[in-house]
Amino acid sequence: MRFWIDDLRNPKEYVQDWGMDDDIWSRSFEEFMMHLQIHVQGDQRIGHIYFDYNLGTGGTGLDCAMLVTSKDWEWALDDHSSWSSHSSDPYGRAKIVDLMDAWRVQTNTV
């Protein structure tokens, strides 16, 4: 299962095989939170998350990264989970990747 988090860019224009599996496009922090609750259950794990930083109003990609690495949701990630940021905002992109990488080191899932 892959997540594309971006309010404007269509994942089909950026990810060659988008839509082949259980791919989910979240356009806001609120949508991402809702999609986690609906689609990630039981033994399902997140395969990859593509983060944008600026999501319009009501949260950022960094908020999404903070949510998925929180004690309530970190179970949805495993040692096969990966992430990237396609944000054009260098500050936001670095903050997201740094947080996700720090989570990986802290949880020893390297």
List each language-model region with its residue ranges.
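Catalytic phosphate/metal-binding cores of nucleic-acid and nucleotide-processing enzymes, i.e., regions
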Residues: M1-V110
